[in-house]
């Protein structure tokens, strides 16, 4: 067996047969195709197949894709065209598109038209939009609806909303949480009652744009500092919210200091502000100072200015000079009051400047019909100008009682015309009956010109001493002025009011 293996391995391996001519040609073609597929030659290159680079595939024509993407330039041109359409639409409304340059607006005219129609539904006209075109940059759903919904929940009236938006359209840009709610919370913290908050915002919507740490806080702090009671702050803000926007150094402090200069104490000024806070809105240079000068020109003494302002603060804000000239002419012609005495009339009752001609003549005619001479009427009016503002029916009843029950001489009324200012049933009748019962004979001044406590003390006397009889016929003009002012306020809507409503002056 070993011999057989040796014999098998000893024979050499036969050489391969040479390929036939046909097979050699086929092998060459196959090798050439394989080489060309693996590394195609680059055009223009003289190198062999191993160094050739692939050709770039040709760009497909637009017709070869169903979703051809526009270029950035095409997109920008489209946006510009749509913005031009929106601008043209705004221009047709009278809005200057240039005012909105750089502001992002709705992409289409249809969306912008929807926004304009919403603003029109709030009773805002095209003129309003032209006055504040930035309102057109507010989204209806993101900006306007939340703000309007919040104002409505506060209690802002629907009919007051258009005026609020015209005066402060910036509210449409506001954030309810960041801008509006803190202001409302501040007002409530100043004791403005919840149902008064919407009235405050309706009257002074600019308040919604104030910062809490700014003018609002400083103005209130100053008022409290001069004596305005803390519990009255809410009432002051409710009746005159504009005070929250007044700068202390430029408006409030100069106003207070000027009133101090004419003799008013700070505490008296604080009481005026508590009662009539709108006086802070009277311009110092164009109203207050000229009116003070006018009073002096028409015979009012400088030392009486403080009393006049305290009794009738509105005198600081009306068109006073022409009013004084008209009233002085009326008093001179109808009551024979001299120019000097006219100043005394204003000092004792500053409200006399608002008396209508009809009211004056009606009271003068009544007094002359009672038997007084015009010269006596003049004296009575100068001493007690309140006669010209009292209720006519009450005056008639008082005079009838004086003439029929008291049976006194008319000269006593000339000396003490304030008799007509006392209540018949509350004061005159009971005091007269007590004096008559005691058998006293006294003047009208002794009878009436004292407090109830003082009168009760007098009724303990057995006789009236000489010093008691020499009672001053003067009376408290401060009390009378307050009484007359209250009557005038009660009778403002009465057709028989002694004040001519057509001649009354109110803050503008």
UniProtKB/Swiss-Prot annotation:
Which GO terms label this protein's molecular function in UniProt?
Answer: double-stranded DNA binding
Q: Which stretches are tagged as biased composition: Acidic residues?
A: 484-508
Q: Which UniProt keywords apply?
A: Chloroplast, Plastid, Transcription, Transcription regulation, Transcription termination, Transit peptide
Annotated region described as Disordered, given as residue ranges: 28-69, 475-508
- Judging by the UniProt lineage, the source's domain of life is Eukaryota
What the entry lists under InterPro entries is as follows: MTERF (IPR003690), MTERF_sf (IPR038538)
Family stated for the protein in its record: Belongs to the mTERF family.
Q: Could you tell me what this protein is called? A: Transcription termination factor MTERF4, chloroplastic
């Amino acid at each position: 067996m070993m011999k057989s293996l040796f014999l098998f391995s000893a024979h050499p391996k036969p050489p391969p047969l040479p390929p036939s001519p046909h097979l050699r040609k086929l092998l060459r073609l196959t090798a050439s195709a394989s080489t060309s597929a693996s590394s195609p030659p680059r055009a223009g290159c003289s190198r062999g197949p191993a160094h050739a680079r692939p050709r770039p595939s040709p760009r497909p024509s637009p017709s070869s894709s169903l979703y051809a993407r526009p270029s950035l330039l095409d997109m920008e041109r489209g946006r510009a065209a749509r913005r031009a359409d929106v601008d043209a639409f705004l221009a047709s409304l009278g809005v200057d598109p240039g005012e909105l340059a750089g502001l992002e607006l709705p992409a289409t005219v249809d969306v912008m038209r929807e926004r304009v129609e919403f603003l029109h539904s709030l009773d805002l006209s095209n003129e309003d939009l032209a006055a504040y075109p930035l309102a057109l940059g507010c989204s209806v759903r993101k900006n306007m609806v939340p703000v309007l919904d919040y104002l409505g929940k506060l209690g802002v009236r629907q009919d007051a909303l258009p005026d609020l938006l015209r005066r402060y359209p910036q509210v449409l840009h506001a954030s309810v949480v960041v801008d509006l709610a803190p202001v409302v919370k501040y007002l409530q913290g100043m004791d403005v009652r919840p149902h008064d908050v919407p009235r405050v915002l309706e009257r002074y919507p600019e308040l919604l744009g104030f910062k809490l740490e700014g003018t609002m806080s400083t103005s209130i702090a100053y008022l409290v500092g001069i004596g305005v009671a803390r519990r009255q702050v809410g009432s002051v803000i409710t009746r005159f919210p504009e005070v929250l926007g007044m700068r202390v150094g430029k408006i409030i402090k100069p106003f207070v200091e000027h009133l101090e200069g004419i003799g008013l104490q700070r505490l008296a000024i604080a009481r005026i502000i508590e009662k009539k806070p709108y006086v802070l809105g009277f311009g110092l240079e164009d109203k207050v100072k000229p009116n003070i000068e006018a009073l002096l020109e028409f015979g009012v003494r400088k030392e009486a200015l403080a009393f006049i302002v305290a009794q009738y603060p509105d005198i600081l804000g009306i068109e006073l000079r022409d009013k004084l000239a008209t009233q002085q002419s009326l008093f001179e012609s109808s009551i024979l009051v001299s120019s000097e005495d006219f100043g005394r009339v204003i000092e004792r009752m500053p409200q006399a400047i608002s008396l209508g001609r009809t009211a004056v003549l009606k009271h003068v005619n009544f007094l002359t019909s009672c038997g007084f001479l015009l010269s006596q009427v003049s004296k009575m009016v100068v001493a007690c100008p309140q006669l010209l503002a009292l209720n006519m029916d009450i005056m008639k009843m008082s005079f009838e009682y004086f003439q029929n029950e008291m049976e006194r001489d008319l000269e006593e009324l000339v000396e003490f015309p304030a008799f007509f200012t006392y209540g018949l049933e509350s004061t005159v009748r009971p005091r007269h009956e007590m004096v008559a019962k005691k058998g006293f004979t006294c003047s009208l001044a002794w009878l009436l010109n004292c407090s109830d406590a003082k009168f009760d003390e007098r009724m303990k006397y057995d006789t009236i001493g000489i010093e008691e009889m020499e009672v001053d016929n003067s009376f408290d003009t401060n009390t009378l002025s307050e009484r007359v002012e209250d009557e005038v306020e009660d009778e403002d809507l009465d057709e028989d009011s002694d004040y001519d409503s057509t001649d009354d002056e109110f803050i503008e």
